[in-house]
Regions:
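Short, polar/acidic, helix-capping and beta-turn segments at strand->helix junctions
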Residues: 1-174
Length: 174
């Protein structure tokens, strides 16, 4: 059985204090889930300010020792409860039957480029990650999510790049 849970810190201290509380809450929750035979399969991390919080988050024990060992995506979407960080976690007693990848470009990879070039770079990174795994984009890709900063400015470049890549690999652009 699959189980989904949203975990958020209750305190309103600093981001670091909230991370410490979230670590304890998450570990407690995952321990209880393990008692029922369910293991972590996926998490989505919601940050209110990814530009300033991402590096701090990925350096935590919570991310390094737990979340990064499973399918995890990190998005900039402020939690509605004002907590600055929330987790959506999926636990299950079933075997995972899919491959999940979450990729982002480094600051260096985005410097002095536009949204078209960045989107092409992201897809090329994805395509390289499939090499030697017996999978290809046309046969095995089910869904893409691309989170775009300043969508009003960057939308056109992202869509053109995605369409160009999809056309190159024989996928439909609809």
């Amino acid at each position: 059985m699959n189980n989904y849970q949203i975990l958020s810190p209750k305190s309103r201290g600093s981001f670091t204090e909230r991370l410490e509380e979230l670590q304890a809450t998450t570990q407690s929750y995952l321990s209880k889930e393990a008692e029922t035979g369910r293991q972590l399969q996926y998490s989505k991390v919601f940050l209110s300010d990814a530009q300033n919080q991402y590096q701090t988050f990925v350096e935590t024990e919570l991310y390094q020792d737990t979340l990064s060992q499973h399918a995890t995506s990190i998005v900039e979407q402020a939690p509605l409860d004002g907590s600055k960080i929330s987790l959506l976690v999926k636990t299950s007693d079933e075997q995972q039957d899919f491959i999940f990848q979450s990729m982002r470009l480094t600051e260096k990879e985005t410097r002095a480029t536009n949204s078209y070039v960045q989107t092409i770079a992201l897809f090329e990174k994805y395509i390289r990650s499939m090499e030697g795994k017996g999978v290809d984009m046309k046969t095995h890709l089910v869904r893409t999510w691309i989170y775009v900063a300043d969508i009003d400015v960057n939308y056109e470049g992202v869509v053109k790049a995605r369409n160009d890549i999809f056309k190159r690999y024989g996928l439909t652009i609809d």
